[in-house]
């Protein structure tokens, strides 16, 4: 069994990763914790901030701050999850890539021979795009997708 865990920096994806690690331990499975930093989404969030705050002069600075904060959050989560995996002597790895979220996830899925995908029920920007990632990948993924809250 090989598990692909989608991590986006949200508490939901972190909880999903913890559960995936427990599944991997019980099933003696290999685990890949995978994260995509999508610059288009950080730009979109910065533009949303610009519109709401009437501070479009700061849009570039805000985009960089969102990017740095997201990268830091994902890095911290990956460090904790990797420590847990190491303590349990699990086979696994992690990867962070930049690109279009859906494309990168599908590319990793197709290259990895995965038998299960695990993700959180809500993403980092759950108030804006609830459930969109599942809708975008579910038609292209031919294995079970476990969605955790």
Predicted regions and their residues:
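Generic structural signal for helix capping and beta-alpha/helix-loop junctions
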Residues: 40-41, 102-104, 126
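Structural beta-alpha unit
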Residues: 80-117
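Small/aliphatic-rich secondary-structure junction motif
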Residues: 2-61
């Amino acid at each position: 069994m090989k598990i692909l865990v989608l991590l986006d920096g949200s508490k939901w994806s972190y909880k999903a990763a913890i559960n995936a690690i427990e599944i991997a331990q019980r099933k003696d499975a290999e685990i890949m914790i995978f994260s995509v930093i999508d610059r288009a989404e950080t730009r979109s969030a910065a533009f949303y901030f610009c519109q709401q705050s009437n501070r479009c002069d700061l849009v570039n600075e805000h985009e960089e701050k969102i990017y740095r904060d997201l990268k830091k959050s994902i890095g911290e989560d990956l460090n904790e999850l990797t420590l847990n995996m190491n303590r349990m002597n699990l086979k696994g790895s992690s990867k962070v890539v930049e690109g279009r979220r859906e494309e990168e996830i599908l590319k990793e899925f197709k290259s990895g021979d995965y038998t299960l995908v695990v993700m959180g029920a809500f993403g980092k920007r759950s108030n804006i795009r609830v459930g969109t990632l599942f809708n975008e990948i579910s038609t292209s993924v031919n294995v079970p997708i476990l969605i955790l809250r």
